[in-house]
Amino acid sequence: MVNKILDSVTIQLGKTFGTGYRYYVENVKQDLQTPCFTIDMLQPLERSRSKVLYDRTMPVVIHYFNDNQNTLKKDSYEMAERVIECLEYLPVDNALIRGENIKWLMVNDVLEIFITYRFTTTKVVDVEDSMTDLNQANINTR
């Protein structure tokens, strides 16, 4: 599911901003071509609600590297608004997941945008596997 979220974020950014930007999900140690976005998953969390229901939390950070040093802050502020609008609702597996706790800031002239996606998933459990742990007890004995 992590890769599906990252893929969907990348696709949405590509649809919104087009081919004039680079989109990186893997680390780039050198030769980062700007303007570009890097997309990372921070610390996903899964909590079990039952044997088949799981609450998932997927915090994503998007870094935007601007190539225009003359209007860096002004361009980055506008970019933050556009990215948030683009990623507020993320299509994944024929459903829309709404981003929450959206915030952004500038760090060392790089725009950082944080969005958390929360959703519930179900796990398919084979009925035969579930039935193997049942034991019959005589409830009429006192």
Residues covered by each model-derived region:
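Short acidic low-complexity segments
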Residues: 24-33
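A short, hydrophobic beta-strand-centered structural micro-motif
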Residues: 33-41
